[in-house]
């Protein structure tokens, strides 16, 4: 597996803060076909050769799964391919970086994420399984 940074460094740095906040853009067009079927709540991302836990996230707006290294940053997105079972998005976050992410739908509680791009000028590659594991704390 290719990797620009280790999974442990990602988790330690807290780069997966994916809680939708006010002003976040909502899914439109081809994004809706798959993303509207995902359940909000507590999700866990696992990946790497040991299937290690990368992060736990409270997912409100599923579109944020398309920009995993840039969290809830205000980014522009271009859907380059989408159907009922997968989507590929190019995104750009001014001053932070950009990426290309493919999400493959398995169930409303399980998706596969494949993302790569630049984060503050440094390349990254992420391949992870995202699984809903319950309600968000305080929900």
Language-model segments: residues:
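Amphipathic/hydrophobic helical signal segments and adjacent flexible N-terminal regions
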Residues: 2-40, 48, 132, 136-139
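Exposed beta-sheet edge/beta-hairpin loop segments within beta-rich domains
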Residues: 18, 34, 103, 119-121
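Low-complexity, acidic/polar, glycine-enriched regions of mature
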Residues: 26-27, 41-42, 49-50, 62-70, ...
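A generic structural signal for short beta-strands and their flanking turns/coil linkers
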Residues: 39-41, 85-87, 107-111, 126
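Short beta-strand segments that buttress and anchor functional surface loops
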Residues: 43-47, 87-94, 103, 113-119
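Central antiparallel beta-sheet cores of small beta-barrel/beta-sandwich binding domains
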Residues: 51-108
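Short, surface-exposed coil-to-beta transition loops
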Residues: 96-101, 112, 123-127
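A charged, solvent-exposed segment within the mature domains of Sec-exported extracytoplasmic proteins
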Residues: 118-139
């Amino acid at each position: 597996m290719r990797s620009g940074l280790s999974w442990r460094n990602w988790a330690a740095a807290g780069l997966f803060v994916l809680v939708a906040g006010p002003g976040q853009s909502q899914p439109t067009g081809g994004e809706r076909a798959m993303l509207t079927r995902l359940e909000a709540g507590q999700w866990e991302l696992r990946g790497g050769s040991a299937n290690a836990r990368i992060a736990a996230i409270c997912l409100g707006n599923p579109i944020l799964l398309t920009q995993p290294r840039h969290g809830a940053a205000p980014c522009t997105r271009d859907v380059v391919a989408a159907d009922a079972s997968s989507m590929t998005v190019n995104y750009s976050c001014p001053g932070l970086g950009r990426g290309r992410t493919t999400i493959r739908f398995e169930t409303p509680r399980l998706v596969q994420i494949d993302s790569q791009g630049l984060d503050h000028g440094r390349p990254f590659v992420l391949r992870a399984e995202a699984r809903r594991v319950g309600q968000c704390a305080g929900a």
